[in-house]
Every structure is written in C-alpha cells, then in structure tokens.
Amino acid sequence: MIKLNNITKIFELPNKKLTALDNVSLNIEKGQICGVIGASGAGKSTLIRCVNLLEKPTSGSVIVDGVELTKLSDRELVLARRQIGMIFQHFNLLSSRTVFENVALPLELESESKAKIQEKITALLDLVGLSEKRDAYPSNLSGGQKQRVAIARALASDPKVLLCDEATSALDPATTQSILQLLKEINRTLGITILLITHEMEVVKQICDQVAVIDQGRLVEQGTVGEIFANPKTELAQEFIRSTFHISLPDEYLENLTDTPKHSKAYPIIKFEFTGRSVDAPLLSQASKKFGVELSILTSQIDYAGGVKFGYTIAEVEGDEDAITQTKVYLMENNVRVEVLGYVQ
C-alpha cells in the first residue's frame, strides 16, 4: 500500500545543507498499522510528510496504492491526496464551525450533495463516538474529543491510508489510550492502512503490527513488533523498549548503592533483560545451581508486544567473584542482557 524507495530529503539552509532523510526505504502492506519511532529531530515528521508530498523528497520515489506520487502533475496529486487522510499533534479545527461542520469541510470542498454529507458525517461521528457533540464548538471540547473530530474529518473522503503525526503526544495517558483504541478499531472495521510516527514505544507496543526505528535521518531497524521486541539489534531500539518499563530499586538499596565494591562482602545488583525465548527458560535458577550463586530478586516485570514476551529482573547476586563472572557470561551466552547497576555493602 505504501512504498518509500530510497527517500532522501535535503533542506537548503542559508549557510548549509541539512539532510533530514538519508536513503530511507519502507514498505507497508495494505491493512497494516506501522509505527515509525525516533527521538526528536530524527526525521520522523519529515518522513511522514513525504508520503503525501507535503514535503517533496529530494530524491527517491513515493508509491501509494500502486500510484507513484512523485510523478504526478499538481492536479493529479490533489486527487491522489484524497486517498490519504492525515491527523496531527495539534487538531487544527475551525473555531467558528461546529463539530459536524468541521468534519463536513472536506466533502463541502468536493461539492458533495447535502444529503450525502448528512449521511456520511452522521456515520463518522457515530464511529468516533461524538454523535452527541455534533452541534458543539471546539472551545467546548476536551483534547481527546478534538482529536476525534480531526480523525473523523480525515476519514471523510474515504481514504485508504491514514497518516498520524504524533497524534497522541499532546494528550494525557487515559485519553491517549482511548485514541489508540479508536485507531485500532478504525483499522479493523475499515481496513485502512495506518502509518503513525511517535517517540513513545508504548504507542507502538499497543497497536502496531510493524515498526521502523529512525535515527538522524536513517532507518536503522525495522520489522514486526514481535521481531523488534524479541531481538532488538540496535542500542536505540533497546532504549525504546526499556522505556516501556517502570521498575526501580527499593529505597533501602538505592541509598546504599555504590559504583564499585568497597569490600569483599559487597555484592553486585544486576539487571537482567529477557526477550523472546529467554523469558520462559529458567535461566536464573539454572545459573544459580550451575555456579553456586544465590540470587535474591528485588523486582521483576514481564510484558507482551506483538505476541512476544519480554521483561526485566533486578537481583542481588551473592557468591565469589569468579562464580558471579561465570554467571554473567552464561546468561549473556543465552541472549540475556546483563547490566551491573552497582554494589551493596
């Protein structure tokens, strides 16, 4: 449905050239939800704006539903864009128009009949859960309701693709959840292909089928959500996955934690990161028996994404230095990421 082939975008600044995208290729199948994740300034917004040519690539091709947009005339591009809806972080609603009138605007611009507009917009407001707000004005809506209006407006022309540019980043956590569930329902019921960009791995984990990681304008990793969570190949992907966990040491340990052991009875506090098959394997108990170390688990958390389990365990590891070293090596050989957080006396 969406094919980006070798997309490069260079901005000409007064004193230099800025490469926002560097030879990016991405393929999204029909009906998929794909998330592009990256830090601020990584090139995410530029990438998504290249899909409907709000930003024209310096080089490369953009193909949507079999049509190469980069080869269309201005008139042809206007028509092709009707198949591509888009929502933004900011809702861009017209304050002087009601909810119904805001959603109806694209159909009015296409000179649709009043009867068709009435039928279509009524159905869309029902879909996004705003039937009772049809005559309300944006000033009387919450942030989540405003985004629902924007989503309905983006769907008014029956697009095959929906682009979401940081659509939940201005919303509180509870509202974010409701918008993500709405997008997932729209994908399921309408079969619409969704490309969203975000800096939050939690968003990707909840609704995406596919994920691409972008860093400094380059696509550094991509695959299904399950593949990326089970076996992240880049440090950036690992950082994003870790950000979905909220685990910490008990205060008693934090107060006594040191970077280096102060004496022979100072034992390491180690964080073990499990993904894929290593989650279910009894590796910690095996290591304990094999090398004669004792592991006192301080905190642990397991989660799912894309049908794959992943998680962390933080433990105090007691034993002689050689045994602890062998334990760490053994676990790393079995695809467990090992990080010494410090030592307790």
From Swiss-Prot:
One of its GO terms (cellular component) is plasma membrane. It is a peripheral membrane protein. ATP binds at G38, A39, S40, G41, A42, G43, K44, S45. SMART domains: AAA, NIL. GO terms for molecular function: ABC-type D-methionine transporter activity; ATP binding; ATP hydrolysis activity. Part of the ABC transporter complex MetNIQ involved in methionine import. Responsible for energy coupling to the transport system. This is Methionine import ATP-binding protein MetN. It comes from Haemophilus influenzae (strain 86-028NP).
